[in-house]
């Protein structure tokens, strides 16, 4: 019987039909994968704007590790100009956050006269306040706070930025790192803006907050599929990038308001900025009588002394997803809705630059 099977001639025609069918299935799967990638993940890069300044690469050694960064300095930047740190998300680098912000901070730097630095994380992620995550190299946690402090000192010496006007912001993992700076290095940063990030819950919290505070903005989308606006576990589709539990965005704002001793009722303003998109601003600040009583200390950045600068603002993008809204680049659909307004970089700069902003409305992203 076996000999008969081996002697039987193969049916070449059937074999070719089967092979063709398999190839069609394979091509269909490839086409489907390409379509899914194009729809959910691919997003064309924005055009590089005409900028006045120069972008340079830099490196320093901190804690035995080589740390790298990009610096943008506008043409004719005067001495004593502000400095803005912009931190990237997980698995990204400085080049990606430039794209992710639509080069918005460099556009603003040209207009308002400040320097921008984009530091790179050493590992896959920034070593933020979350306990969940891989932040170790050779058995020791990476000291990202130390790196950023050394970087600021280096830039102060090289481009003569104003020590009293250093601001920090970041998106996603960079936003979580911004929260750590606000807690552990508040005296070094006049204001901090965390985007697509919330304060970790107590069981997922490892930071040691300093005694004083600084102004903090939290900007989150209500439809963020990765960092839940209402609080809960940080993850993507329940499968990827699990980062532990976080507080809600409102609770995160209240957390910093309590730290900054802002006990009054916050001011709230809601503004429609596009079809299906509205911006809710919740601003915690000192009561008018306390501000008047401390008017002689208006230049003091310590929240426990005057509080005139230690405000807290939650910017809730209703109808927004995971990332910083701006007009020049749409984020991948996998990260949720990507509204082109408000102008996130402009909102952050207005909050950071204004030492004691009054409650206001969002007008195309500018307070």
Language-model features: locations:
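Serine-hydrolase catalytic machinery in alpha/beta-hydrolase-like enzymes
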Residues: 60-73, 79-167, 176-180, 184, ...
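A domain-start/cap signature at the N-terminus of enzymes
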Residues: 2-83, 108-111, 140, 169-193, ...
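The conserved beta1-alpha1 loop
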Residues: 85-89, 196, 220-221, 318
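The feature captures the conserved acid-bearing segment of alpha/beta-hydrolase catalytic domains
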Residues: 190-274, 284-288
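Non-transmembrane alpha-helical segments in soluble domains
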Residues: 106, 149-152, 253-257, 349, ...
């Amino acid at each position: 019987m076996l000999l008969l099977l081996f002697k039987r001639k193969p049916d070449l025609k059937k074999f070719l039909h089967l092979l063709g069918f398999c190839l069609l299935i394979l091509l269909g799967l490839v086409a489907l994968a390409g379509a899914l990638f194009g729809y959910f993940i691919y997003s064309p890069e924005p055009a590089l704007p005409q900028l006045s300044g120069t972008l340079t690469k830099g490196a320093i050694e901190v804690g035995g590790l080589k740390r790298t960064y990009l610096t943008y300095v506008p043409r004719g930047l005067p001495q004593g100009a502000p400095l803005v740190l912009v931190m990237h998300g997980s698995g990204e680098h400085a080049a990606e956050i430039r794209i992710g912000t639509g080069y918005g901070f460099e556009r603003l730097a040209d207009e308002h006269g400040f320097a921008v630095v984009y530091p790179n994380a050493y590992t896959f992620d920034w070593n933020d306040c979350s306990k969940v995550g891989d932040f170790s190299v050779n058995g020791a946690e990476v000291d990202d706070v130390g790196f950023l402090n050394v970087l600021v000192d280096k830039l102060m010496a090289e481009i003569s930025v104003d020590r009293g006007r250093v601001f920090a912001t970041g998106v996603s993992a960079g936003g979580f790192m911004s929260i750590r700076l606000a807690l552990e290095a508040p005296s070094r940063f006049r204001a901090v803006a965390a985007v697509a990030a919330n304060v970790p819950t107590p069981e997922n919290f490892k930071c040691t907050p300093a005694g004083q505070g600084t102004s903090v903005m939290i900007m989150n989308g209500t439809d963020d599929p990765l960092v839940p606006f209402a609080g809960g576990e940080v993850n993507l589709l329940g499968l990827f990038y699990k980062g532990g539990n976080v507080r809600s965005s409102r609770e995160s704002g209240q957390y910093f308001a309590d730290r900054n001793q802002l006990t009054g009722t916050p001011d709230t303003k809601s503004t429609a900025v596009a079809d299906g998109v509205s911006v809710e601003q919740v601003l915690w600040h000192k009561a008018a009588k306390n501000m008047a009583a401390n008017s002689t200390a208006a230049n003091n950045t310590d929240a426990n002394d005057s509080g005139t600068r230690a405000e807290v603002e939650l910017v809730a993008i209703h109808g927004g997803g995971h990332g910083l809204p701006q007009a020049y680049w749409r984020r991948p659909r996998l990260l949720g809705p990507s509204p082109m307004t408000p102008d996130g970089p402009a909102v952050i700069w207005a909050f950071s630059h204004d030492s004691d902003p009054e409650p206001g409305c969002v007008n195309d992203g500018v307070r």
